[in-house]
Structures are given as C-alpha cells and as structure tokens.
Amino acid sequence: RVICGPCQGMIKPVQLQLDIAAIGPPYSRGAGAVDSHSAANFATNRYEQPIQSRGQVVIDGETTELTVRGERDHSWGPRPWDMGWQFLVVNNERFSMLATQVVIPGWPLISMGYYHSHGEAMEHLSETELTLSFNEADPTQAVSGSFSLLCESGRKINGTLEAISGTEI
C-alpha cells in the first residue's frame, strides 16, 4: 500500500530480488547451540551480523537497482517478543554497530550490542542508552531521539536520530 504521494492508498505489485553477503563477523553474547547448528566461537541460536545486499526492486513494473546495507538477525528457537525490545543498527563504510535494550517489568534493564570499526577488532557494548520518541501518527517520521553507548574498551559513542523516511510494516 502506498503511504504518501499522488498514489497514496493504492495497492501496487512489488517484487524484490537481493543477493546478500556478510561484511563482518557474527556477534553474539549468549550461549547456545542447537543440534546440527553449532559453532565454536559464538552462540548459533541467536546472533546478528552486518550484511550488504545488491539486487533490484520492481514496483508496479518500474525497476530500481539497489545496493543496501543492513543487519542479519538470526534466531533459532523461541524468542519472547512480548517484552519491550529496542534495536539501533548502523552499518556504513566506516563502522557497524548494534545496540539493544530489553525492558522486562520488574527486572533490571538488559542492554547489549557491539561496535565494529572496520579494520579493528569488534568491541562489546557495556552500556546502551536509547532515548527515543515514537510518532504513531506518521510512519514516515516514526522515531527520533538520541543514543549514548559505552564500549568495554571505554570508547564512547553518542548521536542523535532523525527519520528521513519510513513505511508501515
């Protein structure tokens, strides 16, 4: 469904073809293995990994070539999505990072993630602070806010967030 512009409200056919390649090591802080699904250096039941994709999207017969970056979120087994999950993923030419916060009523805040400056070793985050505002009325401007991250090495990473685009999912 088109959410803005002259075709707003119309339903258009969409096709997507992507070739996906890992561009960094997998990240995991949890332990775990599943039969026929294990590795020596990281938990295979849950991990994230920076990726780059190339391909094309066809919307209503119009083809657009794509080169995009993102984060592979691999979960094997149940994941309790009824908790307050917040993710911040950045993946560019200089670095990749993932910051996660999980809020469970009555429990201390769970925060984790990684920062990987390309050409350097991946660093675990010891603290994540995500201060976000959500705009439910406009999916194209759905979130704004700030973040403050602390790596185990002492490196600090701070920034602000401003939506430049968005869509309903």
Functional labels for PLM-detected ranges:
Residues 1-169:
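Structured soluble/peripheral alpha/beta segments that form catalytic or ligand/cofactor-binding pockets
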